[in-house]
Amino acid sequence: MSEKYVVTWDMLQIHARKLASRLLPAEQWKGIIAVSRGGLVPGALLARELGIRHVDTVCISSYDHDNQRELKVIKRAEGDGEGFIVVDDLVDTGGTAVAIREMYPKARFVTIFAKPAGQPLVDDYVIDIPQDTWIEQPWDMGVVFVPPLSGR
């Protein structure tokens, strides 16, 4: 990945609220299925905004930090997704999204970020991201002191 897009906690919450507003009325949903691990924080934010208490997970592994690898389903939520929102942080090349669609064909699949290759596979997303850009999520970063450029 040649570029990086840094996401702050504030930005993530703003984007999640925007996405939640598109999922109203909340009463239409039985629950949320968060895609582990990237969808866990967005899933919690959507659950808060929509007042949803039933939150489950589907655990899929496809990355080692910034290296994509073979898809592995570790754990899945039951059912076909009817009445559920499935949420992930990002749709990238679409590998995970294809697996999600197969597991939960009746769910509404949403992400905060979407790259061009994966956009057609999700029902909704908030932010367009170029395909060659790596997203640095706030849960992967720490706040550190950075000395001034002048050194004083």
Swiss-Prot record:
It comes from Cronobacter sakazakii (strain ATCC BAA-894) (Enterobacter sakazakii). HAMAP family: XGPRT. The lineage of its organism: Bacteria, Pseudomonadati, Pseudomonadota, Gammaproteobacteria, Enterobacterales. GO terms for cellular component: cytosol; plasma membrane. One of its GO terms (biological process) is GMP salvage. InterPro entries: PRibTrfase_dom, PRTase-like, Xanthine_Guanine_PRibTrfase. GO terms for molecular function: guanine phosphoribosyltransferase activity; hypoxanthine phosphoribosyltransferase activity; magnesium ion binding; xanthine phosphoribosyltransferase activity. Xanthine binds at residues 92, 135. Belongs to the purine/pyrimidine phosphoribosyltransferase family. XGPT subfamily. It is a peripheral membrane protein. Pfam families: Pribosyltran. This is Xanthine-guanine phosphoribosyltransferase. GMP binds at residues 69, 92-96, 134-135. It is an enzyme of class 2 (transferase). It catalyses: GMP + diphosphate = guanine + 5-phospho-alpha-D-ribose 1-diphosphate; XMP + diphosphate = xanthine + 5-phospho-alpha-D-ribose 1-diphosphate; IMP + diphosphate = hypoxanthine + 5-phospho-alpha-D-ribose 1-diphosphate. Gene3D superfamilies: 3.40.50.2020. Guanine binds at residues 92, 135. It is found in: Cell inner membrane. Pathway: Purine metabolism; GMP biosynthesis via salvage pathway; GMP from guanine: step 1/1; Purine metabolism; XMP biosynthesis via salvage pathway; XMP from xanthine: step 1/1. Purine salvage pathway enzyme that catalyzes the transfer of the ribosyl-5-phosphate group from 5-phospho-alpha-D-ribose 1-diphosphate (PRPP) to the N9 position of the 6-oxopurines guanine and xanthine to form the corresponding ribonucleotides GMP (guanosine 5'-monophosphate) and XMP (xanthosine 5'-monophosphate), with the release of PPi. To a lesser extent, also acts on hypoxanthine. The gene is gpt. Its cofactor is Mg(2+). Keywords: Cell inner membrane, Cell membrane, Glycosyltransferase, Magnesium, Membrane, Metal-binding, Purine salvage, Transferase.
